[in-house]
Every structure is written in C-alpha cells, then in structure tokens.
UniProtKB/Swiss-Prot annotation:
One of its GO terms (biological process) is IMP metabolic process. GTP binds at residues 12-18, 40-42, 304, 330-332, 412-414. It is an enzyme of class 6 (ligase). Pathway: Purine metabolism; AMP biosynthesis via de novo pathway; AMP from IMP: step 1/2. GO terms for cellular component: cytoplasm. It catalyses: IMP + L-aspartate + GTP = N(6)-(1,2-dicarboxyethyl)-AMP + GDP + phosphate + 2 H(+). Homodimer. Mg(2+) binds at D13, G40. Its EC number is 6.3.4.4. The active site is at D13, H41. This is Adenylosuccinate synthetase. It comes from Lysinibacillus sphaericus (strain C3-41). It comes from the Bacteria. One of its GO terms (molecular function) is GTP binding.
Length: 429
C-alpha cells in the first residue's frame, strides 16, 4: 500500500497536472479531493495538449481508475462538456468514477457568485465566478444537492424547488436582480445527471479497496496551499482545503494511509487574482518571465502575476501540509536572466520575518529579502540529469532545496512528460 498526495506550494498553476500525469504512470488509481472547475490542469502527451478542469489527470490511462472525490463541487454541465471533448479526441473515459457524495453546482450558484463579486465594488476577491464558493456555502448550510440527489428525479425536484425559493429571495431582495425559474434548470440538469450516472458511485470504498489490496493511489491536488481557506491568504482564497490534509475529508481516505506528500513549485512564483504577493515583479524581468512561461490562466485566460521564488511561502506550505518532497518546475523559463533571486525572509518595519503572517495588513507592508544568484544563458530543455544542467542552474536548484528544507524529487525543464527528471522515486521513498 502506497499513497502519494500532490499539492501546490504556492497560489496554484505550479504545474501539478504535469507532475500528476508523470506520477500516474505507477499508480493504480488517481483521485481529486478538492475544488471544482475553477482549477485548470494543462497536460502535454505525445505532442498533444489537453486542458482539464474537473477530470483527474489519470483519465489518460485507461487501465487506471480516475476519481472525482466527495470533496469536489461538480458542475454537471461543465463535466459533460469536458467528457465529450476528451471522447471526441479518442480518449476513453470509462475509467472515471464520481463520488455520489460530491455536491452539485447549479445555475443559481454561478448567478450568486457573479452578483456577490459585483457587489464588492473595489474589494473584489478575484473569484472565477464558477459558483464554487456559493456551492460550498450551501454544503455547510446543509441545503446542498449532492450527486446522489441529482440522479433521483423526485428528490432532485423537491430539493431544487426548496433551494430556488431561498435563492430567488436572495437575488430579488438583496442583490436586486431577477431570479431563476424551476423550468429553466430542472430538465437540463437532470439530463446531465443521467448522462454521467454510470460514473457515479461510492468512491471512498473504491480508493480504500485499492489500498487494502496493496495498490498505489495518487491524490491530485488543485490550486495551491496559499489559496487554502484556512491556511492561505484569507480572504483571497478558494472555498476548500487544497492542503494535503484535505485528502482525508475530500476523498474519504484516512490520514494514516498517506505515505508521502509532494509539493509542486515553479522555479519562480505566479498568482491569478487579487491578494498580497511580496515578491511580485512589475518590471521587464517580470514581463519576460510571463511571456516565456506563458503565464495566462487555464480557466480564465487572465495574465498571471509573476515574481521571484519565495521560500517563506514554500516553508509555510511545507509545515501546514507535511510536504516530504518538492517537484521544481519551469527551470527553463529562467534561462537568459543575468541574475536570479530567491526570497529568504521579509522585512517588516525593520523586523526580519521568516514565517508567513496571518494578517494581510502586515503582508502588504512586507519587503522581500533576497539572496541573489548568477543566472544562466544556456538552453536547459534537453537536460535529463542534475549534472547536465549549467552550473548556475544546478546551484539554483540546490539552493531552493536548502532554503526550503525540502528534498527535491523531480525537476522539470519544459512542459512535456519526458522533460520531467527524477531525483527521488516518491513511490519508493
């Protein structure tokens, strides 16, 4: 029995899909445990590019089980569209399983998300307006509709009528916008439910059975630890728990069954949306990193904010998520820079801070303290071992490991599967 959790150590978009795809080769099952279609994974296989939002990266291995766990919130319309897109490209999706306990995103969640963001004025939190937050709100308020409900026509009708009565009062009285009708939702979404019904089951049992039989399970994280609702830069966070601990809740697998946690980082930092970002770059170097790294959101298409690698952030992620290994991506993006910098601490009003503050007011006033290293001009995309990297690039990788206190398991020099280079096999570690 072995299980590996993949988490993002920054604000998402670190390349988790690439690492998950790579590690999936040795897994028997691959499961997502948090988030929804607000997170995007880009995967390159045999020269083909695939962009996933809900479906686990393991879908490309027909002999392996791919699981959408109970911790996700699922938009059936988006899921059906994504499934058809894969099927049209010749990908067999019969290995997908969806938790019957996963909550369902409905049109009123999206409408509420948009209305709520607009009502914030200048204090927007940068939501993707996919209905994620409102769906999690309903889950906690115990009025959510789960997959098991969606598949039962009578129960779905009853719950939908009840919820629409509540939501329409909210739309009309509070947001002062027009409500939604039962008719424009019911048949369409019940239809989506019937299209995906064959995939819906008790996924917790499936995953635990794999582990009981001595198999390997890979848990695919979404977003990043700094977007975690508890451990991230609140309120500029998502509504779920992307930390490794989210596996126990969102996949129905006990914490004692997790054997290792691999944190994924870029060789720099990026962020979409608002919120503090101490190492953010606004100069030509930042623009170069953005363009070379193609830093535009998979889900939103928005330009990502970019900055230097921040060890304060990654050490925080290591601590709250129990990270045992690091996957360092996008080293190739830094090629051509005369100098590269690593943030080692923050300066706050003359005080050196080495732990990530909870107070956003403090973070916004923090100045990064950098360690500067010489850059490299060589093309590293063909490097397959640490020794093949230019000396300065190799020193950069080693310094990241030293400053974060995390052993590096893989380093990547490009988006393709064969450009991921293994230093430690986490399945055997």
């Amino acid at each position: 029995m072995t299980s590996v959790v993949v988490v993002g150590t920054q604000w998402g978009d670190e390349g988790k899909g690439k690492i998950t795809d790579f590690l999936s080769q040795k897994a028997d099952a691959i499961a997502r445990f948090a988030g929804g279609d607000n997170a995007g994974h880009t995967i390159k296989i045999d020269g083909e590019t695939y962009k996933l939002h809900l479906i686990p990266s393991g879908i490309f291995y027909k002999e392996k089980t791919s699981v959408i766990g109970n911790g996700l919130v699922v938009n059936p319309k988006s899921l059906v569209t994504e499934l058809k897109g894969l099927q049209e490209r010749g990908i067999n999706t019969d290995n997908l399983r969806i938790s019957n306990r996963a909550h369902v995103i409905l049109p009123y969640h999206i409408k509420q998300d948009i209305a709520d963001e607009e009502s914030r004025g200048d204090n927007k939190i940068g939501t993707t307006c996919k209905g994620i937050g409102p769906c999690y709100q309903d889950k906690v308020a115990r009025i959510g509709i789960r997959m098991a409900d969606l598949l039962d026509k009578d129960i779905f009708e009853e719950k939908l009528r009840h919820n629409l009565a509540i939501k329409n009062k909210l739309f009309e009285k509070f947001y002062e916008v027009e409500g939604l009708t039962f008719e424009e939702i019911f048949e369409e979404y019940y239809g989506y439910g019937q299209e995906i019904a064959k995939y819906v089951t008790d996924t917790s049992k499936i995953l635990n059975d794999v582990l009981d039989e001595g198999g390997k399970v890979l848990f695919e994280g979404a977003q990043g630890i700094l977007l975690d609702v508890d451990q991230g830069t609140y309120p500029y966070v998502t509504s779920s728990n992307p930390v490794a601990g989210g596996v126990a809740i969102g996949a129905g697998v006990g914490p004692s069954r997790v054997t290792s946690v691999i944190g994924v980082s870029k060789a720099y930092t990026s962020r979409v949306g608002d919120g503090p970002f101490p190492t953010e770059l606004f100069d030509e170097v930042g623009q170069q990193i953005r363009e070379v790294g193609r830093e535009y959101g998979t889900t939103t298409g928005r330009p990502r904010r970019v900055g230097w690698f921040d060890t304060v952030v990654v050490r925080h992620s290591r601590r709250v998520s129990g990270i045992t290994h690091l996957a360092l991506n996008s080293i190739d993006v830094l090629s051509g820079l005369e100098t590269v910098k690593i943030c080692t601490a923050y300066n706050y009003k003359g005080e050196t801070i080495t732990e990530y503050p909870a107070n956003l007011h403090i973070i916004e006033q923090c100045e990064p303290i950098y360690e500067e290293l010489p850059g490299w001009s060589e093309d590293v995309t063909a490097c397959r071992t640490l020794e093949e990297l230019p000396e300065n690039a190799r020193r950069y990788v080693e310094r990241v490991s030293e400053l974060t206190g995390i052993q590096i398991a893989t380093f990547s020099v490009g988006p393709a599967r064969e450009q991921t280079n293994v230093l430690v096999d986490v399945w055997e570690a």
